């Protein structure tokens, strides 16, 4: 019990002050991690707040960032040698983006209540068309998050629907994983999440 309390204390007070590179050094995994991942600190200008929940890499090299606050930003200027990012607001007013994929000029955004296709129809760099791809599940509590995937080879997306209460929900399909086909058909595929 005493060592558990010490661990919680250390995690609470010291981990937030560390950097990702230092954690790898501390664990002795930094050299191995560098074979797979490059960690680059990206400065975010004040007063911009980005509580990132999902990312997608665009064909032109920009990064799309979906946020818990419901914004979708496009970020350019990310270079590991000298990052000088530029953040552009593409869409706002969404609900806790925890899934983001990009295909054929459209963003597929997983929100708590639906999977939405978002496009820029007039080419001004801002979203102007929002289409519901699937809303085949319920939503009853602000803690009932939905987590989306990238596309599989057949063009399907998957959504994991969290529960706000243990083992039951009043909302349809909470605690399930859903498969959404390219045609928008929603298929429950696994329960007990």
What are these regions (language model features)?
Residues 1-4:
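N-terminal secretory signal peptides that target proteins for export/translocation
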Residues 6-16:
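Bacterial N-terminal signal peptides
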Residues 21-193:
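Beta-propeller blade termini and top-face loops
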């Amino acid at each position: 019990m005493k060592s558990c309390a010490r661990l919680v204390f250390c995690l609470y007070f010291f981990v937030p002050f560390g950097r990702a590179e230092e954690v790898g050094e501390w664990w002795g995994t930094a050299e191995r991690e560098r074979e797979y991942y490059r960690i680059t600190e990206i400065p975010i200008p004040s007063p911009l707040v980005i509580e990132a929940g999902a990312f997608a890499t665009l064909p032109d090299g920009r990064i799309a960032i979906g946020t818990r606050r419901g914004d979708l930003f496009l970020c350019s200027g990310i270079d590991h040698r000298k990052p000088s990012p530029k953040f552009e607001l593409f869409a706002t007013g969404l609900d806790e983006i925890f899934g983001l994929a990009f295909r054929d000029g459209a963003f597929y955004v997983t929100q708590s209540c639906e999977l939405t296709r978002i496009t820029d129809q007039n080419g001004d760099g801002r979203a102007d068309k929002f289409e519901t791809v699937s809303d085949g599940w319920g939503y009853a509590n602000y803690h009932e998050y939905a987590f989306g995937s990238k596309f599989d080879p057949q063009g399907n997306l998957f959504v994991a629907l969290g529960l706000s209460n243990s083992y039951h929900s009043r909302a349809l399909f909470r605690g399930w994983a859903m498969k959404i086909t390219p045609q928008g058909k929603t298929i429950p595929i696994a329960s007990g999440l």
